[in-house]
């Protein structure tokens, strides 16, 4: 595919997380697609920074010398927009493209997560490596006009190009000469000595750029020009040799090729993962201008995107410091080869090194299915690098037997281009799992409600769809790379099975299928000038008996610009490091410190000019600083760090500048402002001892306790360290910074903590279980804790059945065995659990002093007795939960009593005949109603049915809350709930809650009344005048099929209209329904909703809601389609549009009825003709014969005749006759054109007055008549010409009108005219002097054109119409002429 008009294009096929590229990419996905690439070798954009952009730069400063306006698409990960009933696709991933003058990155990724991830195109970045080597300029003499001098430069230079910014200034003429139309050639005024060389750091730094595609150049280190060598001396007096040669043998590279699992899915998918190519390239000094080297990649690799325009993105290699081109690129895609040809740059510089960082992609075309150990290789120069990967494609989306998959395979978007907005292709696999499906249907739609800026579109004007059947045994390419030569093109079979619908959609009816199909959708983008449009296209497959399944694809695009030119600015930077030995000098093994804030001030104005935060490796860089003195201040040091000594040693790039220092920028970057910090370390600890006398003080004879766990935490409670005490009870935490710490001692088993802080000696007392220790510039060895051995006690008593419910243990009351009793500490933690023995006794042993919680589990079927009865705590009940205290003795007083109560619940179900929700005396119960009792957890306890009196009852119930559910009896409806204020008489509804609290509850009742039924229906009538209203004269249509659907879309009734057009559905409940009228054959739906609801037509499908009433307003009307187009056109006559009114005539098909004149229908139009008459004046008809005079009428006539053209005088010919009829006055009619009002004719009857008689003058008045009236003359002839005459006479149009009406036949009469009228329609054309063609199509109930049977070619049809029209017109004119003669006599 060729690049069209060099427009910026967007494409995608490949998924790479290329960040910091010139064109940011956003991507919303829904499907799987194959991968291609978008990678370039631009080595910087000179003055124009290539940066990741989230938005488009609207304009560049006037000083900008070059700008690039590009569009890129972003990677989108989101939940697949599937609508499976599952409505979401799983795991399919899709890729999006990024595109710019340098790069394009593409890919399909399925919509799985509603999030946006930036994916960028390829950007070139200059290496920031610190190195002792740098490309140096080759010596020249003054004759060569080479004045470039490069000074030595050392130090750290992180992300040099990434952070470069430019102060825009108006470029000089010299600078303008350097500016090319393309952004990559813009010049940057940065000297070559700003770049360092280090191969390893080069590649690493490129990696730090977040997978962007870089091609980096390292310029020479030396600053002094080399002595002139032989080659350069020769260059001064003679041109360089033009012979070019392959110098692959002079190119050395250190290359890695790595498979990247971009989404960490543990599988490698061409549509979403990629290959990372990193290489350091060294150019031998023997290389000269014109020489070239190559990069070749295997056929399993792609390096440009889906967009055929992307091939231009293989860019030249440039020096980012001065914009010079080092090597030009040429891409031979057929042979997988990139050729770089060196410019004279290599003649002027030695030791040229380049570092590249590509993201390249796997070619799905060569990997059609899952495969292990697929080889990928890249050869740079003569050195080949190879890797392998196991390729796994995502599974197709499946639901039951349905399966589907899709991908965008080509996208070219031209933002802002109205004439060519671009196009895209989507491939959909239908039934790729090759199942037998019934009634299969596919819907493809460029619509999703979450993406209103969608620029996709599907409609029959711009969309082309090809459909292929997959042969048996054929394996589809899982990367959606389809070779249609292997498939069977069945597109023609779907011509009548393809329907374009709303929401930019198309539906394909596959019917019953037994094989897979490939659907290829090619369509255009909608025009947009949006900076961030989206493209979303869904595909849904459904079939009989299976869940539908959906997939889709989405892309997002972002427009960006870049460009600029400016004066030279420099950078300040260096390093913050942890000076572990505190000597103030950076040494090996000492690491950088991140997140330190560095602020730069202009030392003269004290103005803040820049700020940065150190990276994880401790480096920082502040750009855009002109020459001057700057104060560098470090702040926000990590907590606990101190500053190392400043200005140690004699190397300012390795010493520490301290928290604040002043440095100078003078014609180059200053990378010497650094800071060393360190952490001082201290100890914390003491002793854990057994305090045998429990006095809280360490006595001489008391010994330490070994093995005690001690935990150290920071102020936020985070555990830092844990130790245990040694044999002497000692513990220590080491290497601690200044700060506050928490120390926690774990109580040894069998011990109790002693009293805290007894006495005045803090080194001898106990600090307790938890204490705080502070380190402030010294060790803290004062935190100790004492414990003593804990004595043990018992707790327990008795659980009994309190039969008399008095809350006290009586001598005759027995214990309850098997009751669960739980012991907890004060914090609610369970310590022990036991059960009562056969006598109801329980006991907990081995307890220390303290407060405990005792909980008794209520035995099944029992209720706790009253608590605390009487004064004897040894025999009362403590309840189900109580507190027990042990203080140096056993506690045997904790007991609990229970008893067994039961109750009843129920009431009444009655028929609420008056629907008032209250039980009235004369209302009776309903028997056989099912009532269900549930507990609070909805567990069914019992079910009963009401007795013959409507009563029900649940017995043997314990206290508690219950749910009661009444089942609605068949044929009944629940009455209103809780009416009135008597809870025993109202209805509690279908579901209610009943509480039993020490008494029966007999208040839960429910009322029902018999459910009323309703009817729905009305009338289907023949709308003869097509006005969409039922007129008294219009009759019903018999045997029209009417279908009734419920709210779920299920057919619940079908009927046909009776002989009067009436239909009716009965026994309907209140609810929502849909009524569908099946259009009678040969009839057309009339206009809908034109008047009051019970008289207008509601259309073929009507939604209706029945709410407690019948609805007899759902009617529909049809009329018979007109066959003669001629009329319709008559508008033309209406030249004056009055004709258009004449359409109304057309309404008056009545004329048409008159068929004979059927043309007369045309008459109706003819009215319009009449207008046309005025046109006729235009005597186009005149052409037609002298009659032409009469043409004015003739027009109408002419119209009448040759419908086709009649107006078109061509018809007029034949019409001419007809004209001739009208001739008589017709001209006057022409006046009548004014009649064009002829709409009045629309009555077409007015036509009957054929003003012609009136001499048309009258017509002119009657204009209304004027129109077709002239025709009417002939009409007059036709039926009761008398009328027509009268009309003519009547001149008074009034008559004419009446006449016209009278027969409307008049039209018919005017058949001759009518013919002409028909022509008149054609006249419309006639006006244009083009013959009118007969209608060749009708419309079915889907408003789709259907071809009428062919009876000959269009010319013959038109000629016949003209011929017959002419004959009728001639006959009419003879009759009229004879009549006039008689009158003259």
Swiss-Prot record:
Regions of compositional bias (Low complexity) in chain numbering: 205-214, 1081-1090
Motif LPXTG sorting signal — list its residue ranges: 1348-1352
Localization per Swiss-Prot or TrEMBL: Secreted, Cell wall
Q: Which Pfam families match?
A: Big_8, Gram_pos_anchor, SdrD_B, SdrG_C_C, YSIRK_signal
Complex and partners: Interacts with host DSG1; this interaction increases S.aureus adherence to keratinocytes.
Q: What protein family does this chain belong to?
A: Belongs to the serine-aspartate repeat-containing protein (SDr) family.
Q: What is this protein called?
A: Serine-aspartate repeat-containing protein D
Origin organism of this chain?
Staphylococcus aureus (strain Mu50 / ATCC 700699)
């Amino acid at each position: 595919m060729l690049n069209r008009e060099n427009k910026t294009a967007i494409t995608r096929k490949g998924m790479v997380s290329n960040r910091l590229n010139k064109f940011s990419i956003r991507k919303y996905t829904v499907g799987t697609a194959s991968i291609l690439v978008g990678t370039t070798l631009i080595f910087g954009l000179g003055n124009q920074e290539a940066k990741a952009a989230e938005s488009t730069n609207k304009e560049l400063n006037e000083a900008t010398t070059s700008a690039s306006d590009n569009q890129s698409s972003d990677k989108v990960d989101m939940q697949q927009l599937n609508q499976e009933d599952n409505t979401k696709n799983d795991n399919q991933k899709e890729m999006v493209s990024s595109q710019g003058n340098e790069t394009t990155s593409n890919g399909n990724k399925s919509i799985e997560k509603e999030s946006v991830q930036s994916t960028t195109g390829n950007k070139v970045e200059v290496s920031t490596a610190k190195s002792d080597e740098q490309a140096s300029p080759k010596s020249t003499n003054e004759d060569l006009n080479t004045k470039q001098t490069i000074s030595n430069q050392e130090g750290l230079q992180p992300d040099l190009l990434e952070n470069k910014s430019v102060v825009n200034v108006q470029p000089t003429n010299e600078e303008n000469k350097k500016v090319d139309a393309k952004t990559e050639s813009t010049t940057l005024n940065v000297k070559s000595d700003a770049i360092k060389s280090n191969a390893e750091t080069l590649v690493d730094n490129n990696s730090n750029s977040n997978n962007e595609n870089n091609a980096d150049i390292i310029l020479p280190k030396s600053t002094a020009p080399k002595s002139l060598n032989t080659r350069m001396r020769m260059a001064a007096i003679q041109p360089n040799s033009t012979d070019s040669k392959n110098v692959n043998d002079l190119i050395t590279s250190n290359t890695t090729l790595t498979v990247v699992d971009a989404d960490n899915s543990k599988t490698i998918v061409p549509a979403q993962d990629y290959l990372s190519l990193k290489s350091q390239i060294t150019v031998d000094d023997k290389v000269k201008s014109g020489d070239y080297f190559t990069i070749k990649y295997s056929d399993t690799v792609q390096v440009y995107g889906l967009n055929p325009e992307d091939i231009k993105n293989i860019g030249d290699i440039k020096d980012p410091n001065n914009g010079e081109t080092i090597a030009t690129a040429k891409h031979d895609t057929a042979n997988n080869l990139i050729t770089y040809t060196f410019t004279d740059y290599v003649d002027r510089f030695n030791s040229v090194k380049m570092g590249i960082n590509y993201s390249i992609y796997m070619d799905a075309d060569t990997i059609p299915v899952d495969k292990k150990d697929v080889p990928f290789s890249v050869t740079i120069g003569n050195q080949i690098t190879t890797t392998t990967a196991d390729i796994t494609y995502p599974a197709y989306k499946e639901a039951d037997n349905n399966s589907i998959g899709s991908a965008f395979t080509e996208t070219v978007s031209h933002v802002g281009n109205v004439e060519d907005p671009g196009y895209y292709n989507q491939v959909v696999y239908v039934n790729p799992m090759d199942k037998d499906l019934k009634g299969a249907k596919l819907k493809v739609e460029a619509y999703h409600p979450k993406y209103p800026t969608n620029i996709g579109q599907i409609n029959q004007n711009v969309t082309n769809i090809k459909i292929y059947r997959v042969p048996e045994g054929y394996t589809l390419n899982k990367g959606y790379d389809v070779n249609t030569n292997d498939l069977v093109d069945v597109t023609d079979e779907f011509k009548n099975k393809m329907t374009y619908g709303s929401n930019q959609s198309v539906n394909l009816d596959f019917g019953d299928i037994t094989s897979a199909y490939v659907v290829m959708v090619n369509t255009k983008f909608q025009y947009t000038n949006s900076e961030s449009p989206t493209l979303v296209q869904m595909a849904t497959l459904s079939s009989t008996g299976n869940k539908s399944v959906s997939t889709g694809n989405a892309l997002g695009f972002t427009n960006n610009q870049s460009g600029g030119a400016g004066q030279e600015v420099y950078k300040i930077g260096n390093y913050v490091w942890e000076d572990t030995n505190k000597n103030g000098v950076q040494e090996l093994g000492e690491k950088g410190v991140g997140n330190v804030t560095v602020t730069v001030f202009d030392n003269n104005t004290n103005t803040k000019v820049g700020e940065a935060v150190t990276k994880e490796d401790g480096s920082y860089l502040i750009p855009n600083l002109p020459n001057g003195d700057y104060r560098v201040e470090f702040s926000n040091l990590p907590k606990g760090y101190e500053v190392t000594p400043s200005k140690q040693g004699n190397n300012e790039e390795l010493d520490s500048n301290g928290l604040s220092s002043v440095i100078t920028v003078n014609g180059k970057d200053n990378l010497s402002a650094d800071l060393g910090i360190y952490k001082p370390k201290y100890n914390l600890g003491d002793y854990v001892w057994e305090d045998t006398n429990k006095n809280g003080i360490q006595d001489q004879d008391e010994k330490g306790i070994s093995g005690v766990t001690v935990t150290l935490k920071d102020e936020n409670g985070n555990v830092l360290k844990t130790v245990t005490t040694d044999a002497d009870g000692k513990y220590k935490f080491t290497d601690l910074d200044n700060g506050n710490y928490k120390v926690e001692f774990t109580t040894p088993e069998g011990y109790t903590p002693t009293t805290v802080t007894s006495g005045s000696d803090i080194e001898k007392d106990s600090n307790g279980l938890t204490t705080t220790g502070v380190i402030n510039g010294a060790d803290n060895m004062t935190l100790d804790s004492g414990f003593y051995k804990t004595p043990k006690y018992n707790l327990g008593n008795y659980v009994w059945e309190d039969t008399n419910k008095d809350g006290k243990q009586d001598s005759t009351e027995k214990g309850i065995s098997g009751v669960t009793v739980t012991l907890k500490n004060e914090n609610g933690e369970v310590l022990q659990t036991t059960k009562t023995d056969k006598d109801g006794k329980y006991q907990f042993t081995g307890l220390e002093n303290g407060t405990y919680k005792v909980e008794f589990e209520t035995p099944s079927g029992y209720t706790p007795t009253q608590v605390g009865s009487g004064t004897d705590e040894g025999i009362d009940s403590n309840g189900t939960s109580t507190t027990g205290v042990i203080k140096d003795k056993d506690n045997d007083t904790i007991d609990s009593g229970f008893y067994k109560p039961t109750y009843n619940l129920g009431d009444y179900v009655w028929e609420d005949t008056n629907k008032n929700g209250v039980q009235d005396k004369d209302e009776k119960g309903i028997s056989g109603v099912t009532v269900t009792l549930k507990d609070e957890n909805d567990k069914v306890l019992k079910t009963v049915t009401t007795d013959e009196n409507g009563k029900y009852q649940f017995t043997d119930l314990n206290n508690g809350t219950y749910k009661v559910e009444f089942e609605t009896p068949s044929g009944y409806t629940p009455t209103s709930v809780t009416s009135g204020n008597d809870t025993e008489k109202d209805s509690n509804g279908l579901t209610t809650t009943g509480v039993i609290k020490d008494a029966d509850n007999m208040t839960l009742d429910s009322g029902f009344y018999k459910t009323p039924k309703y009817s729905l229906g009305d009338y289907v009538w023949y709308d003869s005048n097509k006005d969409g209203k039922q007129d008294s004269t219009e009759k019903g249509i018999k045997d029209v099929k009417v279908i009734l659907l419920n709210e779920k879309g299920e057919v619940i009734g079908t009927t046909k209209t009776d002989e009067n057009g009436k239909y009716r559905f009965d026994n309907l409940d209140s609810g929502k329904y849909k009524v569908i009228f099946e259009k009678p054959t040969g009839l057309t739906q009339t206009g809908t909703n034109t008047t009051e609801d019970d008289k207008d037509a509601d259309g073929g499908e009507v939604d209706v809601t029945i709410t407690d009433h019948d609805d007899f307003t759902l009617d529909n009307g049809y009329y018979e389609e007109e066959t003669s187009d001629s009329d319709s056109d008559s508008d033309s006559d209406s030249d004056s549009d009055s004709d258009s009114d004449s359409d109304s005539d057309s309404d008056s098909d009545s004329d048409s009825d008159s068929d004979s004149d059927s043309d007369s229908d045309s008459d109706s139009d003819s009215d319009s003709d009449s207008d046309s008459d005025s046109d006729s004046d235009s005597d186009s008809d005149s052409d037609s014969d002298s009659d032409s005079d009469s043409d004015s009428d003739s027009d109408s006539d002419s119209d009448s005749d040759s419908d086709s053209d009649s107006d078109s005088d061509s018809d007029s010919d034949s019409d001419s006759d007809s004209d001739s009829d009208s001739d008589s006055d017709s001209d006057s009619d022409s006046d009548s054109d004014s009649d064009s009002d002829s709409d009045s004719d629309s009555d077409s009857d007015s036509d009957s007055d054929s003003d012609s008689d009136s001499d048309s003058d009258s017509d002119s008045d009657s204009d209304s008549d004027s129109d077709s009236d002239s025709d009417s003359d002939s009409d007059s002839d036709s039926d009761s010409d008398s009328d027509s005459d009268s009309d003519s006479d009547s001149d008074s149009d009034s008559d004419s009108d009446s006449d016209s009406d009278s027969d409307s036949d008049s039209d018919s009469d005017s058949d001759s005219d009518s013919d002409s009228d028909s022509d008149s329609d054609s006249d419309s054309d006639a006006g244009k002097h083009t013959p009118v063609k007969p209608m060749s199509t009708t419309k079915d109930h889907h408003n789709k054109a259907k071809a009428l049977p062919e009876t000959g070619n269009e010319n013959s049809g038109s000629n016949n119409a003209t011929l017959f029209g002419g004959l009728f017109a001639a006959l009419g004119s003879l009759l009229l002429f004879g009549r006039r003669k008689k009158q003259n006599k």
